[in-house]
Regions:
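Small-residue hotspots at the loop-to-helix junctions and early N-terminal turns
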Residues: 47-58, 136, 199, 273-288, ...
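Transmembrane helical elements of multi-pass membrane transporters/channels
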Residues: 19-38, 138, 142, 149, ...
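Short alpha-helical transmembrane segments in multi-pass integral membrane proteins
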Residues: 1-21, 78-144, 190-248, 304-369, ...
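Generic alpha-helical transmembrane segments of integral inner-membrane proteins
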Residues: 25, 29, 33, 37, ...
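Small-residue-rich hydrophobic transmembrane alpha-helices
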Residues: 50-109, 113, 146-165, 278-342, ...
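Short runs within selected transmembrane alpha-helices of multi-pass transporters and secretion channels
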Residues: 68-71, 75, 139-157, 165-173, ...
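Helix-terminus/linker motif at the lipid-water interface of multi-pass membrane proteins
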Residues: 29-51, 119-126, 182-193, 251, ...
Length: 457
């Protein structure tokens, strides 16, 4: 193939990828900002309210990630049907996914409502248990709604329409601020709820986003061919079981990645407030930087799934490669900026020189794993497009929990290889774990792509 033609294909695919990914990036940043707003507004009430919200977040966010990961199975299935031109089959599939969302969202809500035993097992200050549970139970009321919203979002994403989630995410963020104010301080005849009010505001925003997405999907012309609202159907276990076969491994893999950072935070907790603060700064900034390759991975799911639906496995492999290349290009930029501006980044969060020193050191490790993180998250997204999720889950679990965490513990907290290096050793373990995940998932993606090409030949 001539070089000009090849470059033209890359540019065209990159353009299509970014058209999908840009709204996803904005939506993810809006969702992240909601948590930031809750933290800031609760902190202005009292340290106790801030602590209660932080404790509640540490419980409901992992549950949310597990739940939404399971429901992500909707995206590749919709994308493949859309790519195949079989839009009539999309409506029945999504109707079953909505039943699954109702069950998973309701189950998650019940779990959060009864999560007091988790707080007590964590030896949380008894004075914080009641406000933390009030916050959790308020958020739990919104979980069925946000589960249903997420399926509709996956339906829209699978069709290649990612703008609705961006618009609703921005409006949700703008709604969250006044809702927090009303519930926290007790306006319009409501009692002042403090940090618990942040939970009710979050639940309200979840409900609003569901209503907004329902209206969008119901009336926008681009969804009519799918006939989602054409008829009512009772749950069909066979279809739901197929969704679970794809979705449960996705949920477990997402949960495994998120929870390892939580475990490392707990391990660092015994090293002093300065170390914990530095770790939190590095982790918070890394999480924001991660939103872009994560969004590219979500877009890769759609591009790969649609290409496979069209019966073009070579185009699917090409789309996966371009998504990984785009993520690596971004990683070069983000890693360079993090290395050059690590102290300035830490200074945004705190004026404390000791905390800045710790955070700047850990940001170096974050810069190092930008490349492996970019590869693993886009490879995982592309593998979802292939509906290859079970092995992906096993590889992810092994990389993070079988390699990364043990290496981090040995280097950071044990004297097996010399004096323990504290937080640096634990973050070195993250670098090793993410690198192993990147290598294994890239190999798995290459094999899955070759297998689908051979099936066509």
């Amino acid at each position: 193939m001539p070089t000009d033609t090849r470059l033209g294909r890359v540019r065209a695919e990159l353009r299509s990828l970014l058209v999908l990914a840009t709204p996803i990036i904005i939506a993810q940043l809006a969702h992240t900002a909601m948590g930031f707003v809750d933290t800031v507004m609760a902190g202005r009430v009292s340290p106790q309210d801030l602590a209660a919200v932080a404790l509640g977040n540490s419980i409901w966010v992992p549950v949310f990630l597990l739940m939404t990961g399971v429901l992500l199975a909707t995206t590749p299935k919709v994308a493949q049907r859309f790519g195949a031109g079989d839009e009539a089959a999309i409506g029945p599939l999504v109707r079953q996914a909505l039943w699954l969302a109702l069950a998973v969202g309701g189950g998650a809500a019940v779990l959060l409502w009864n999560a007091e035993f988790v707080l007590r097992a964590m030896n949380v200050d008894p004075a914080l248990v009641t406000p933390a549970m009030g916050y959790l139970r308020a958020v739990a009321c919104g979980f069925p709604a946000v589960a249903l919203y997420h399926v509709l979002r996956c339906f829209s994403d699978g069709l290649g329409h990612t703008r609705p989630s961006m618009v609703l995410g921005i409006i949700g963020l703008l709604l969250n601020i006044p809702a927090n104010y009303i519930f926290i301080y007790g306006k319009f005849g409501l009692p002042a709820m403090g940090g618990v009010g942040c939970g009710w505001a979050t639940a309200l925003v979840m409900g609003f986003m569901l209503v907004g997405m329902l209206v969008w999907v119901r009336w926008a012309p681009c969804y009519r061919a799918s006939a989602l609202f054409a008829r009512f159907e009772w749950p069909q276990w066979l279809v739901i079981r197929r969704l679970l076969a794809i979705g449960v491994p996705i949920g477990v893999a997402v949960f495994a990645e998120a929870s390892i950072f939580a475990v490392i935070a707990l391990l660092i907790g015994g090293l002093g407030a300065t170390v914990v603060a530095g770790h939190q700064i590095a982790l918070n900034f890394s999480s924001m930087v991660f939103m872009i390759p994560y969004s590219l991975g979500m877009a890769a799911t759609v591009r790969v799934g649609q290409a496979l639906g069209r019966g073009q496995p070579r185009e699917a492999r090409f789309a996966a490669g371009v998504s990984m290349g785009a993520a690596l290009g971004y990683a070069c930029l983000s890693a360079s900026l993090m290395l050059l501006l690590r102290e300035q980044i830490a200074q945004i969060y705190t004026p404390d020189k000791a905390v800045i020193a710790v955070a700047a050191t850990l940001i170096v490790y974050s810069a190092l794993f930008q490349f492996s993180d970019a590869i693993q998250v886009t490879a995982a997204g592309a593998l979802r497009g292939y509906q290859d999720t079970r092995i992906t889950m096993l590889l992810t679990l092994f990389a993070y929990w079988g390699i990364g965490l043990p290496v981090g513990y040995v280097l950071g907290l044990s004297d097996w290889l010399g004096a323990p290096s504290g937080p640096s050793g634990l973050w070195q373990g993250l670098v090793v774990g993410l690198t192993c995940a990147a290598v294994m998932l890239a190999i798995r993606l290459a094999r899955s792509a070759r297998k689908r090409i051979r099936q066509v030949i």
